[in-house]
Design a protein with these regions (language model features):
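Acidic, serine/threonine-rich low-complexity intrinsically disordered linkers/hinges in large eukaryotic
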Residues: 106-136, 140-276
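Contiguous, well-ordered alpha-helical segments that form the cores/surfaces of helical PPI scaffolds
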Residues: 20-24, 95-102, 138-146
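Catalytic cores of large soluble enzymes that bind and process phosphate-bearing ligands
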Residues: 10, 32, 71, 166, ...
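HEAT/HEAT-like alpha-solenoid repeats
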Residues: 1-12, 23, 27, 38-49, ...
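A glycine-rich, aromatic-flanked flexible loop/lid motif
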Residues: 48-51, 67-72, 86-95, 106-114, ...
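Residue-level detector of extended alpha-helical repeat arrays and alpha-solenoid scaffolds
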Residues: 15, 22, 33, 52-53, ...
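Short sequence/structural elements of tandem HEAT/ARM alpha-solenoid repeats
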Residues: 1-3, 16-17, 31-40, 53-54, ...
Length: 276
């Protein structure tokens, strides 16, 4: 919590790395995964622009892989509340869209959390969202329409408009989900839109891998900055050559001056002239 509080005052140049390290520490030392979810949501609210996809993907993976207890229901309810304000960071919308599409049914019986309410809360962000987020929302809408009868008349016009979207991913998803209901039986559609299976649990989390990659990128950047460029090396070589040429000219001029100033050499010149 102290690190999260310090993040507000941290320099923008180090925030991304700080967010990544806080996320790793929160996962590593979490005694309660609900606290871990809350910590990541704090990171999103404080410094959402610096929360990478790897961080929120990891939240989704952990929540999906822990069906026991109330973690999935807790996360769905918490994210629905987090996405309720109209001004909400887009990363929070992405996480909420995915989690509600998978586990929103666990809280649909609670006051203010029905399937229709879930759709309305998510869809208020549609206009301000990037295409990547809209693609996630389209998949969530398909799942909500499959689970809740009251969502179908709300989702249908959205999909109809999306079929003409300039974004290929949004256009394709909406067209496929619309055609799915017409081409398959309700049982087949339900089977196709059921919640995702658990993710493969790798020994090294994607967050730790991302941190190592970032540290490697930073080291490479420092080394590159310290190493002179080809143009700099060429200029240095030209400067050295010019310096050597100037030194040679100066040495030659000094030698000639010494000859003129040497008395013995001057008398030799007069003697030689007398012989002729």
């Amino acid at each position: 919590d102290e690190l999260v509080a310090h993040l507000v005052l941290a320099d923008a140049a180090i925030r991304e790395e700080m967010v990544l390290k806080i996320a790793i520490l929160a996962e590593k030392y979490a005694t309660d995964l609900r606290w871990y979810v809350d910590t990541i949501l704090k990171l999103i609210s404080i410094s959402g622009d610096h929360v990478s996809d790897a961080i929120w993907h990891r939240v989704v993976q952990i929540v999906t892989n822990h069906p026991q207890g109330d973690l999935q229901a807790y996360t769905a309810a918490t994210l629905l509340v987090a996405a309720s304000p109209r001004r909400c960071h887009e990363t929070a919308v992405r996480v909420a869209a995915y989690v509600l599409g998978e586990f929103g049914f666990l809280v649909a019986e609670r006051p203010g959390m029905s399937g229709e309410e879930q759709f309305r809360i998510l869809h208020q962000h549609w206009v301000t969202c990037a295409p990547q987020t809209r693609a996630i929302l389209v998949s969530t809408y398909a799942k909500l329409a499959n689970l809740y009868e009251e969502c179908r008349p709300l989702v249908a016009p959205v999909f109809a408009r999306c079929k003409n979207s300039v974004n290929v991913e949004i256009q394709q998803r909406s067209a496929e989900y619309s055609a799915m209901r017409e081409a398959f039986s309700p049982e087949a559609v339900e089977d196709l839109l059921r919640e995702m299976p658990p993710f493969e649990d790798k020994k090294q989390s994607a967050l730790e891998q991302r941190l190592r990659e970032k540290e490697g990128d930073d080291s490479a950047a420092v080394a590159k900055a310290a190493r002179p460029s080809a143009a700099q090396r060429q200029r240095a070589a030209q400067s050295a050559a010019a310096t050597r040429a100037a030194e040679e000219v100066a040495a030659q001029q000094a030698a000639e001056q010494n000859v003129l100033n040497d008395p013995s050499l001057s008398s030799m010149k007069w003697t030689t002239a007398a012989l002729y």
